[in-house]
């Protein structure tokens, strides 16, 4: 059994100065019934806590670190950029360079605006959709999390699901009434919504692979159906690729599935571990944003040189071969853990998309929020604690996915499988 005494003391101190002792709710580890583990440093696929424990990290700062921790080239470029200045409040060529790289790789994006977070990206995209169409209603999907903007905290996933909340107090009814929620992967319900509200719907926002109720890929025809419905009714299709962008595929989820939205929201990977977000799409829509158009959006640190530098270096290192390797390693991890669970009589369902992996303690299939919630959360908490003691750091929530990086080795994968075997054996014996 590992010692977490320093983390325990650090958490007690943190609770005196921060709400719940953390700056994002899922970091409180409430759903796994333990105190949060405080981290000190990371290198490659490994992360180290303040008690000196080492872990193979499958959280990767909730997705951004696709090259692993402290990638030497990324760190070097950030250091060089910082020496020139951390922020100017004026344009830099770095912004243009990253924008050109994003436009080159993301099928839907002709023009892109940089912001400082994924939440900013989705909020700004919704304002743009409303301003462009002259309509007010937005459709989202149950269990999909698009940041903490008021109009999107309706039946959200991620940390909201982890805390067992349907939505958040503080969201005015006047805002909530313009958000329509539909079960994920349910195209028939979408057709009914458009039959009733089609002329009032500004846009449909969707995670092309849901990543905030665990990992839940789209069923066949779902994304294609959304594209057809929105085009028919003059609404915008918005892909929230903050998580899936450059994780599912070299050309993002839209490239992988062959469905092109009107607007795309990005974040995480494109900042290489620094705060960033972006939204982009067709030129005729994006040109409505100030200063070229009347729809306002601004940000003090948008496009700051450190985030642009980290994002540029990260994307430059990713190649189509990177994604083939992700798939190979994810296949092995899924097969090994599935076999270990089956051997010990533990129900386990895997979902996967590129370097995103989700597994649920249920017999499945898991295709939406309702089926995701059927997972045995008590069993997940047992598994989580056991894997932490075995030196494997997982997301402390059933409703979050695992991430792979280019730094994960075959030895890391085998160590993780062996750890899962031991943990499942202990759980099986105790039941």
Swiss-Prot record:
Q: Name one GO biological process term.
A: protoporphyrinogen IX biosynthetic process
Enzyme class label: isomerase
- The reply on keyword Nucleotidyltransferase is no
Q: Which GO terms describe its molecular function?
A: glutamate-1-semialdehyde 2,1-aminomutase activity; pyridoxal phosphate binding; transaminase activity
Q: In which pathway does it act?
A: Porphyrin-containing compound metabolism; protoporphyrin-IX biosynthesis; 5-aminolevulinate from L-glutamyl-tRNA(Glu): step 2/2
Q: Which reaction does it catalyse?
A: (S)-4-amino-5-oxopentanoate = 5-aminolevulinate
In short, the EC number is 5.4.3.8
GO cellular component terms, alphabetically, are:
cytoplasm
- The signal peptide annotation in the UniProt record is none
UniProt cross-references to CDD domains, sorted A to Z:
OAT_like (cd00610)
What keywords appear on the UniProt entry?
Cytoplasm, Isomerase, Porphyrin biosynthesis, Pyridoxal phosphate
Q: What is its main location?
A: cytoplasm
Instruction: Establish whether keyword Translocase is in the entry.
Output: no
Report the residues modified as N6-(pyridoxal phosphate)lysine.
Answer: 268
Question: What NCBIfam families does the entry give?
Answer: hemL (TIGR00713), PRK00062.1 (NF000818)
Which family does the record assign? Answer: Belongs to the class-III pyridoxal-phosphate-dependent aminotransferase family. HemL subfamily.
Listed name of the protein: Glutamate-1-semialdehyde 2,1-aminomutase 2
Origin species, per record, is Bacillus licheniformis (strain ATCC 14580 / DSM 13 / JCM 2505 / CCUG 7422 / NBRC 12200 / NCIMB 9375 / NCTC 10341 / NRRL NRS-1264 / Gibson 46)
């Amino acid at each position: 059994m590992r010692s977490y005494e320093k983390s325990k003391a650090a958490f007690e101190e943190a609770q005196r100065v921060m709400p719940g002792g953390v700056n994002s709710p899922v970091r409180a580890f409430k759903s796994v019934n333990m105190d949060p583990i405080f981290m000190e440093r990371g290198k490659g696929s490994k992360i180290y806590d303040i008690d000196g424990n080492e872990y193979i990290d499958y959280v990767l700062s909730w997705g951004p670190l696709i090259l692993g921790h402290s990638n030497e080239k990324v760190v070097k470029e950030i250091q060089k950029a910082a020496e020139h200045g951390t922020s100017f409040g004026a344009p830099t060529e770095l912004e243009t360079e990253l924008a050109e790289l994003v436009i080159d790789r993301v099928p839907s994006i002709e023009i892109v605006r940089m912001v400082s977070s994924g939440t900013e990206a989705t909020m700004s995209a919704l304002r743009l959709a409303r301003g462009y169409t002259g309509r007010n209603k937005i459709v989202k999907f149950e269990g999909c999390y698009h940041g903490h903007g008021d109009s999107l905290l309706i039946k959200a996933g991620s940390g909201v699901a982890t805390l067992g909340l349907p939505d958040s107090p503080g969201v005015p009814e006047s805002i909530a009434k313009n958000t329509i929620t539909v079960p994920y992967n349910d195209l028939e319900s979408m057709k009914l919504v458009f039959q009733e509200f089609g002329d009032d719907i500004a846009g449909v926002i969707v995670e092309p692979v849901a990543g905030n109720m665990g990992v839940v890929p789209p069923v066949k025809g779902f994304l294609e159906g959304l594209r057809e419905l929105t085009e028919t009714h003059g609404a915008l299709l918005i892909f929230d690729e903050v998580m899936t962008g450059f994780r599912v595929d070299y050309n993002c989820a839209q490239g992988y599935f062959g469905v092109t939205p009107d607007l795309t929201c990005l974040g995480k990977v494109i900042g290489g571990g620094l705060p960033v977000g972006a939204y982009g799409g067709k030129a005729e829509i994006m040109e409505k944003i100030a200063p070229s158009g009347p729809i306002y959006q601004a940000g003090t640190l948008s496009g700051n040189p450190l985030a642009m530098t980290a994002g540029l270096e990260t994307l430059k290192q990713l190649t189509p071969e990177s994604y083939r390797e992700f798939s190979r390693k994810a296949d092995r991890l899924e097969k090994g853990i599935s076999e270990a669970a089956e051997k010990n009589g533990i129900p386990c369902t895997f979902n996967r998309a590129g370097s995103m992996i989700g597994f649920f303690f249920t017999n499945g299939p898991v295709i939406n929020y309702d089926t995701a919630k059927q997972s045995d959360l008590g069993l997940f908490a047992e598994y989580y604690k056991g894997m932490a003691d075995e030196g494997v750091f997982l997301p402390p929530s059933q409703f979050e996915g695992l991430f792979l990086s280019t730094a994960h080795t075959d030895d890391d994968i085998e160590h993780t499988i062996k750890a899962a075997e031991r943990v499942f054996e202990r759980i099986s014996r105790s039941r």
